[in-house]
Amino acid sequence: PIETLAESSTYLESAFALVYGDLPNASQLMEWERAIARHSALPVQVVHAIEALPHDAHPMAVMLAGLNSLSSMHPEQNPAIAGGGIYNSHAVQDKQIVRIIGKMTTLAAHAYHRNTGRAPAAPNTRMSYAENFLYMLDAGLDNRHRPHPKLAKAMDVMFLLHAEHEMNCSTAACRHLASSGVDVFCAVAGAVGALYGPLHGGANEAVLKMLERIGNVENIPNFLAGVKEKRYVMFGFGHRVYKNFDPRAKIIRKIANDVFELVGRDPLIDVAIELEKQARADEYFVKRKLYPNVDFYSGLVYRAMGFPPEFFTVLFAIPRATGYLSHWRESLNDPDQKIMRPQQVYQGEWLRDYVPITSRSRSLTDAMEDIQPSNAARRRMAGDPSDAHPWFGNGMEMSTPAWQSGTTVGDATSGVENCLVKNVAAGK
């Protein structure tokens, strides 16, 4: 049960079980943790690629750039280069898995510090996975820094709870990409790209904004009434799988209390607890089986630990990479696996005749919207000597340069011609 894993296991131990099907023994766990730690550093070329991004780049965009850059670093294990059978080797599969798990926290640390303008601390391979992640965020140049054990434990359990949750949008994207034979970095990057979407990975941030809008417990009855009247949306409740209480939500609520004991109580936790209490006592929500899910309390935990809301999805992507890799490995070893090709039901027009362009009228159904250039683009085009500028039809006209007017071409170019003649005569 997930409650037992959260209490007794660790993220990496549970990750081993996800990938290989069973919990490891002591020697297997030690080798697994060491292999992941050995692959935690990023190639310098990937670091340079990240450093070339804008300082205000979204952390998930930085994660995607890093993963895609890693795709170019190991051509000898890329099916498109080394041959389609390269992943038939379990040893090759396993090496790619530990590479990505090891590098996810390092990529995340670089994504975090892209906004701060500082470089993260180098990975500390003597620390646990979650402890090393916090170390890279906070140590700076102080290699004696040690994250607080309670915060490291909270981070580890949060990773464990988010590692995998059956088939979903991003996991399906990973398996879909893997079926074409792409390298594993592209498959995981595609999945992380799907997670970037606010309908998938941004639910805990939406919960936080909802609680902030409610403000205090006195406003909860009015909010719940608005939800029933379709005036408000209640985030963090309900799940496609769990029709009763999401067990992960109970665990995260306990983690929240542990974190608050250390860093101080977030006043929004009282709003969250009372909202949960009133919703669970309301027949409207009970009848619809709307109970708190994993996202309801996780944003409060992340905020209490000092993470900005735009970083929440990165904290989701780090552990979920293990789930993606488990599905990737499973699909590779499935003898019946073929390239995925979903069927589509076409509902458009059937056979039509080709109409010459001079006889066509403007489409009345669907057409490209007018794309207005920026003022900077208009400035550049105003100095462009080309004849046709379709964007200048909106009240803007370009004066014709003298050298384009036809009657003054000779005059306009005579100075250039004379200069060329003099240079040739002088041997230049």
Tell what function each PLM region has.
Residues 1-395, 403, 419:
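Non-transmembrane, aqueous-exposed alpha-helical and coiled segments at domain scale
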